[in-house]
C-alpha cells in the first residue's frame, strides 16, 4: 500500500547551500521531518549547480518520511544570467534592460523543456520569450 501524503512543500533554494535556517527550517519543521537529513541530501544532489537557485518539491508523508525532486532553475534566473543583468526592468513595456539572441533563447528553452507545459521546443521558446518580455529583456 502506498504511503499517505501529508503535505507537498515547494521551495527555491540556492544550490548546495541548504541549511536549517529560515526559510527551510520553519517550512519543513512544522511537518516534523528531519531538516538536516533534507539539507544534506539536497546539497549532495545540487553540488554541481552551485551559484543557481534550484527549486525543490518536497513530498512529506504521514510517517514523517519525505521524498523530493529538484527542478530546473527558474526561467527568470536563466534569462538574467544570459543577459548579464542583476534584475529585470521596473517598467518592462517602456524600457529594455538587455538583449539576448534567439540562440540563447533556444538554449534556455531546451534546459527548461522538461518543466514547461510545452509540446515542442518552439512552444517552450514562446513561453521563455514571454518571460523575457515581462522582464524588459528583448529577443533578437
UniProtKB/Swiss-Prot annotation:
InterPro entries on file: Ribosomal_uL11 (IPR000911), Ribosomal_uL11_bac-typ (IPR006519), Ribosomal_uL11_C (IPR020783), Ribosomal_uL11_C_sf (IPR036769), Ribosomal_uL11_CS (IPR020785), Ribosomal_uL11_N (IPR020784), Ribosomal_uL11_N_sf (IPR036796)
Assembly and binders: Part of the ribosomal stalk of the 50S ribosomal subunit. Interacts with L10 and the large rRNA to form the base of the stalk. L10 forms an elongated spine to which L12 dimers bind in a sequential fashion forming a multimeric L10(L12)X complex.
Any GO BP annotation: translation
Protein name as annotated: Large ribosomal subunit protein uL11
Keywords noted in UniProt: Methylation, Ribonucleoprotein, Ribosomal protein, RNA-binding, rRNA-binding
Classification via PANTHER family: 60S RIBOSOMAL PROTEIN L12, LARGE RIBOSOMAL SUBUNIT PROTEIN UL11M
Post-translational note: One or more lysine residues are methylated.
Recorded GO CC terms: cytosolic large ribosomal subunit
Function, as annotated: Forms part of the ribosomal stalk which helps the ribosome interact with GTP-bound translation factors.
SUPFAM superfamilies: Ribosomal L11/L12e N-terminal domain, Ribosomal protein L11, C-terminal domain
HAMAP family: Ribosomal_uL11
Family, as annotated: Belongs to the universal ribosomal protein uL11 family.
PROSITE patterns: RIBOSOMAL_L11
GO MF annotation list: large ribosomal subunit rRNA binding; structural constituent of ribosome
Amino acid at each position: 500500500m502506498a504511503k499517505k501524503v501529508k503535505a507537498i512543500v515547494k521551495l527555491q533554494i540556492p544550490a548546495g547551500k541548504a541549511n536549517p535556517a529560515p526559510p527551510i527550517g520553519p517550512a519543513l519543521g512544522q511537518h516534523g521531518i528531519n531538516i538536516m537529513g533534507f539539507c544534506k541530501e539536497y546539497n549532495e544532489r545540487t553540488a554541481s549547480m552551485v551559484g543557481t537557485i534550484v527549486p525543490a518539491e518536497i513530498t512529506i508523508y504521514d510517517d514523517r518520511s519525505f521524498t523530493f525532486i529538484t527542478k530546473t532553475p527558474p526561467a527568470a534566473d536563466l534569462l538574467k544570467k544570459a543577459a548579464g543583468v542583476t534584475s529585470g526592468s521596473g517598467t518592462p513595456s517602456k524600457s529594455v534592460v538587455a538583449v539576448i539572441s534567439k540562440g540563447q533563447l533556444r538554449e534556455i528553452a531546451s534546459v527548461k523543456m522538461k518543466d514547461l507545459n510545452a509540446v515542442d521546443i518552439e512552444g517552450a521558446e514562446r513561453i521563455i520569450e514571454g518571460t523575457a518580455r515581462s522582464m524588459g529583456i528583448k529577443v533578437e
